Each structure stands twice: as C-alpha cells, then as structure tokens.
C-alpha cells in the first residue's frame, strides 16, 4: 500500500426514494455483482415490511438500528516486545457506520427466514429494539474492550 497519497473519498449519491446517503451506502453493501436494482428492491421491500409491522417511519427505524449497533470502542492487536496485546481504541465515526452496516447485513444473511427482504426487515426491527445478532456482536466487541482495559496505555 502506497504511503504517498491517501485515497480520496468518492461522493455518494443519495438514494432516489428517501434521499439519504447512509441508505445508499447500505444498499451498496447489500449489492452483489453490481446488481444495484436488486439491492434496492431488497431494501425498499424490507422498509415496506417495517412500516407495516412497526407503524413507524422506516427510515427512522433504520437510523435507530444503526445507532444501536454502532460500536464506540473496539480492540486492535498491538505487538509489544514479543507479546501481542488486544488494545482497546475508540472507533472513528466513519468506521462506526461501516461496521454497523456490515454487522446488520451479516446478521440478516445468517437468519433463517425465507427471503432476504424478510430477514433484513426482521434484523432491522430487532436492532432498533436492541435485540438480534448485530446488537450481540456490538456487545461482544464492547465486552472484549472492557476485558482488555488494562492494556489501554498501549494506544497509538
């Protein structure tokens, strides 16, 4: 990896229906093989189910789910004198968002519902209510950081 220039961030175009940039990033993460129309159909279908089940604005449920899943602290490996320590560090806001999106999608794909639309809507509703595998992943990450708090002075 070149140290000369850091890659410049590309501008993300907001999605057509809700006009939200974070939702576009979410769709792009769901997308396989560049098939964005399928990813959009999955997300919008899941949002329709969320609206039916919760009687709330689906975008606010989505934002609440992201907030509940996003980690504030994580551990990173640091090698000091032959020993590798798991050092707790704060998570940057961009990485928090990316991790939350990734964990929600992974948890949704791991569910046993019939279609991805059902799985995604169920996982988003669970995450918005502080339940589900994505929230469990965040709690595990925080627990690891808490357990390794003694090594926090090795921060970089």
Swiss-Prot record:
This protein's source sits in the domain of life called Bacteria
One Gene Ontology BP term is: translation
Q: Which InterPro entries match?
A: Ribosomal_uS7, Ribosomal_uS7_bac/org-type, Ribosomal_uS7_CS, Ribosomal_uS7_dom, Ribosomal_uS7_dom_sf
State whether keyword Transmembrane applies. no
Record-linked Pfam families: Ribosomal_S7
Report the GO terms under cellular component. small ribosomal subunit
| Recorded GO MF terms | rRNA binding; structural constituent of ribosome; tRNA binding
Q: Does the keyword tRNA-binding apply?
A: yes
State the UniProt keywords alphabetically: Ribonucleoprotein, Ribosomal protein, RNA-binding, rRNA-binding, tRNA-binding
Please give the PROSITE patterns that the UniProt record associates with this protein. Answer: RIBOSOMAL_S7
Q: How does it assemble?
A: Part of the 30S ribosomal subunit. Contacts proteins S9 and S11.
> PANTHER family this protein is in?
RIBOSOMAL PROTEIN S7
What does it do?
Answer: One of the primary rRNA binding proteins, it binds directly to 16S rRNA where it nucleates assembly of the head domain of the 30S subunit. Is located at the subunit interface close to the decoding center, probably blocks exit of the E-site tRNA.
Under NCBIfam families, the record lists:
rpsG_bact (TIGR01029)
Q: Which family does it belong to?
A: Belongs to the universal ribosomal protein uS7 family.
Q: What is this protein called?
A: Small ribosomal subunit protein uS7
Which species is the source of this protein? Answer: Beijerinckia indica subsp. indica (strain ATCC 9039 / DSM 1715 / NCIMB 8712)
The organism's lineage is: Bacteria, Pseudomonadati, Pseudomonadota, Alphaproteobacteria, Hyphomicrobiales
